[in-house]
Amino acid sequence: MRSFDEIKHLPQFPGIYGFKGPNDIKDNYSYIGLSNKLRERVSQHLLKRDSSVATGGSAISLNPDKIAECHWWIHESFSTREYLEAEELIAFERFNPTLFSRGSPSTKALDISNNEDFKKQMEKLFSNVPSGYIKFYDLSWAVNKIKQLENEILELKKVISDKEK
């Protein structure tokens, strides 16, 4: 079971987001989606678990307990729905996620996504570090962290003991 407390730090404005599983490498994403309100949509997937991709209503679905990270990208053009949809299409091409958003883009979004200048601009955005990210920790992470801290405490005790001699 993962802790999703960090969702409260997500911005509440338009953006493209990607979910990574614990074994996904650098540019691999399990799911890419878009939202007019990032925090609300990510909460719908991971906390409420009532999004179409998380309810298990199809053969392939999102398992919130397997999501280790959420990355997001923001851009000034994301406030326009057609541009947000176009950017999602470019993100699909760039990252080739395991699962895609189930929405159908508008004709205008398809046209925008085929504009070479726009495509280059979005490729640059998605090639750089995401605008933000959060990690969702699970019990195994906590156990490993405790072990690491115990080892550090033992090392510090040894240093103190050696200085007292």
PLM regions with names:
Residues 1-14, 22-28, 36-165:
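Boundary/linker segments flanking structured domains
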Residues 33:
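Conserved catalytic cores of phosphodiester-cleaving nucleases, focusing on short active-site segments
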